[in-house]
């Protein structure tokens, strides 16, 4: 199983020094990948609860860096690790602009890009960027169509229900062909079908492994029904540790636990067939130095298992 680490793109350590420092440390520690998230607002009165825990949005989101620009900085200070988004909201910019940005990143990183796309959870952000909250699934499908077309055609045009692209020469191609892998965050039945039929893989969040493997089995079954080879799909699991000083009850894992319990969870995830697991320590009260030390102990513990 590959092991990744989230960059400090949220909170007080969302700085150039933070991004560069974690990037270099991750590569030195043997991490396989670095990941960024996406926010455009931190509303004082959100219209929807945060979908995890007590429903309160983490204070770290009040300070947020652009995920793709942060990834560019990380790429400039690393040579080996892959660079992924978990998740980039697929609908907050026109698909053609998204295609150009992702293609540029894949070229500049030498083919180290993993594109993780999602739809978000907060209508406020959609209002702020003037994108309708309703009809997100159809908008995502058309966005995926445009990404694929832009990456695979020398001459490309698109006429769809939402977007029109006049015929154009596409001279810049991704380093990875036919394009960087696109993974989707999804939990509804329709979303899981979209992963199975259209994506290179799935971006779930940490949950009990029995439930996780059940959802993954659903995706693989749908992929086979669609005529795809299920073995070509991969899963990259996000874990946001809520660290406790004392050992948590087993039923609380992975919602809370000690570092050792999260190491055990990661080992069990590997045995359950998870292809990649990455941890995001950005919501902890620890200093950046303490989180870097913890990241070192985490990967050492998982690799030793």
Named regions from a protein language model:
Residues 1-305:
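Active-site-adjacent structural elements that line small-molecule/cofactor binding pockets in enzymes
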């Amino acid at each position: 199983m590959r092991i990744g680490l989230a960059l400090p793109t949220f909170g007080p350590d969302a700085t150039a020094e933070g991004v560069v420092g974690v990037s270099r440390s991750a590569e030195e520690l043997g991490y396989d990948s670095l990941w960024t998230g996406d926010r455009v607002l931190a509303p004082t009165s959100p219209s929807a609860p945060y979908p995890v825990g007590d429903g309160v949005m983490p204070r770290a989101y009040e300070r947020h860096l652009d995920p793709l620009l942060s990834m560019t900085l990380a790429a400039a200070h690393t040579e080996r690790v892959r660079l992924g988004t978990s998740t980039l909201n697929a609908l907050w910019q026109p698909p053609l602009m998204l295609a150009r940005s992702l293609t540029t990143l894949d070229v500049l990183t030498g083919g180290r890009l993993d594109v993780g796309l999602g739809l978000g959870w907060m209508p406020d952000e959609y209002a702020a960027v003037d994108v309708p909250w309703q009809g997100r699934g159809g908008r995502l499908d058309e966005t995926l169509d445009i990404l694929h077309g832009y990456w695979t055609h020398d001459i490309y045009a698109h006429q769809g229900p939402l977007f029109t692209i006049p015929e154009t020469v596409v001279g810049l191609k991704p380093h990875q062909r036919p394009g960087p892998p696109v993974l989707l965050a999804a939990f509804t039945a329709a979303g899981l079908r979209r992963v199975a039929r259209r994506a290179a893989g799935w971006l779930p969040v940490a949950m009990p492994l029995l439930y996780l493997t059940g959802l993954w089995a659903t995706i693989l079954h749908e992929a086979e029904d669609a005529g795809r080879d299920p073995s070509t799909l991969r899963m990259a699991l996000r874990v946001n540790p809520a660290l406790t000083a004392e050992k948590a009850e087993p039923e609380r894992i992975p919602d809370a636990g000690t570092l050792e319990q999260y190491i055990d969870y990661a080992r069990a995830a590997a045995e359950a067939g998870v292809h990649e697991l990455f941890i995001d320590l950005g919501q902890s009260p620890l200093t950046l130095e303490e989180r870097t030390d913890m990241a070192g102990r985490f990967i050492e513990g998982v690799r030793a298992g």
